[in-house]
């Protein structure tokens, strides 16, 4: 491998190695290298061979390697390095020491409700800190959030001093309003809604009458007349099982199915058994007259 010397001396005037380089290469102080030595002088072409060859033509191995601090860098490496005393990059300024961490959070307090913990701190128009709830309320309503929550509205049935404008009662399960907007009790309101007239005062009662809601009997099963078992036959109406009269005998069982007639069997024609057609005939077939065959009864002849 060969390198081109960027700033080397002229090809005709080789420069002797210094004393330290001569000691490293095994030469005497101030002694110049020869062509057959460990390292040849600069060739006329200006190229330097960095492969040290010994006199015998084999690769020579140095016996002592100086530390990296004592070895001077080549001349072409100095051209690539920035000048000393200048920052590594023109746009980069002086390096500041890294801080150990973010500054501790200062103690904050909401100027409206005095809260010290909130998921998000906000500011009012004057720059004071507000908690998230007070800040949102001030942003939407334009005023500070009230510190005392307003009480819930009283139920209509528990309003004190409410009197029915028709019957003058103050006890009802539900307050209604008349077409004129006056409060009326539940009874007077329903009566006017159904009849379009005011409820007469003679119908007023001191107590509140509630309706007893009964469970509808539509879902219940109706028992058949006679008190028998609901499962009865649809034909004669006589109950089946033990729910009927024990003195009556049980119905007779249904007749058993009659076997198929033999003449109908012969009129069917060929019969399929196990995937084969077996025609009826007299020649050694299924009903044939041969050995092991079946003989038709007298008076009946198989039909083909």
Swiss-Prot record:
Effect of substituting residue 158 to R: Reduces acetylation and activation by EP300
GO MF entries: DNA-binding transcription factor activity, RNA polymerase II-specific; RNA polymerase II cis-regulatory region sequence-specific DNA binding; transcription coactivator binding; zinc ion binding
Keywords per UniProt: Acetylation, Activator, DNA-binding, Metal-binding, Nucleus, Repeat, Repressor, Transcription, Transcription regulation, Zinc, Zinc-finger
Skewed-composition ranges (Pro residues): 247-258
Keyword Transmembrane helix in record: no
Positions of the UniProt region annotated as Disordered: 77-100, 202-262
Any one cellular-component term (Gene Ontology): nucleus
Subcellular location per the Swiss-Prot or TrEMBL entry: Nucleus
Biased composition (Basic residues): 211-224
Biased composition (Gly residues): 225-245
CDD domains: ZnF_GATA
PTM annotation (N6-acetyllysine): residues: 151-152, 158, 214, 218, 220
Pfam families: GATA (PF00320)
Tissue-specificity statement: Erythrocytes.
Any one GO biological process: cell fate commitment
Span of zinc fingers (GATA-type): 110-134, 164-188
Changes after translation: Acetylated on Lys-158, Lys-214, Lys-218 and Lys-220 by EP300. Acetylation increases DNA binding and stimulates transcriptional activity.
Subunit structure: Interacts with EP300; the interaction enhances transcriptional activity as a direct result of acetylation.
Domain text: The two fingers are functionally distinct and cooperate to achieve specific, stable DNA binding. The first finger is necessary only for full specificity and stability of binding, whereas the second one is required for binding.
Function: Transcriptional activator or repressor which serves as a general switch factor for erythroid development. It binds to DNA sites with the consensus sequence 5'-[AT]GATA[AG]-3' within regulatory regions of globin genes and of other genes expressed in erythroid cells.
Protein name: Erythroid transcription factor
Protein source organism: Gallus gallus
């Amino acid at each position: 491998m060969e390198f081109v010397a960027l700033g080397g001396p002229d090809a005709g005037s080789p420069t002797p190695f210094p004393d330290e380089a001569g000691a490293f290469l095994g030469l005497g102080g101030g002694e110049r290298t020869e062509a057959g030595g460990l390292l040849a002088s600069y060739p006329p072409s200006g190229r330097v061979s960095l492969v040290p060859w010994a006199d015998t033509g084999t690769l020579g191995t140095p016996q002592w390697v100086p530390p990296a601090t004592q070895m001077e860098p080549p001349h072409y490496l100095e051209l690539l390095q920035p000048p000393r005393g200048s920052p590594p990059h023109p746009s980069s300024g002086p390096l500041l020491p890294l801080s150990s961490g973010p500054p501790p959070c200062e103690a904050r307090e909401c100027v409206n409700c005095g809260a010290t913990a909130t998921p998000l701190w906000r500011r009012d128009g004057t720059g004071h800190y507000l908690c998230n709830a007070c800040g949102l309320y001030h942003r939407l309503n334009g005023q500070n959030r009230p510190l005392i929550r307003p009480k819930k509205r009283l139920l209509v049935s528990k309003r004190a001093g409410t009197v029915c404008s028709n019957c003058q009662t103050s006890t009802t399960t539900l307050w209604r309003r008349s077409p004129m907007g006056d409060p009326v009790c539940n009874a007077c309101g329903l009566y006017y809604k159904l009849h379009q007239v005011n409820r007469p005062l003679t119908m007023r009662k001191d107590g509140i009458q509630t309706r007893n809601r009964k469970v509808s009997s539509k879902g219940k099963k109706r028992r058949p007349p006679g008190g028998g078992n609901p499962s009865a036959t649809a034909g004669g109406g006589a109950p089946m099982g033990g729910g009927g009269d024990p003195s009556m005998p049980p119905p007779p069982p249904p007749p058993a199915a009659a076997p198929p007639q033999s003449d109908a069997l012969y009129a069917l024609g060929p019969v399929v058994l196990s995937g084969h057609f077996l025609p009826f005939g007299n020649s050694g077939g299924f009903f044939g007259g041969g050995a092991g065959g079946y003989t038709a009864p007298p008076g009946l002849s198989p039909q083909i």
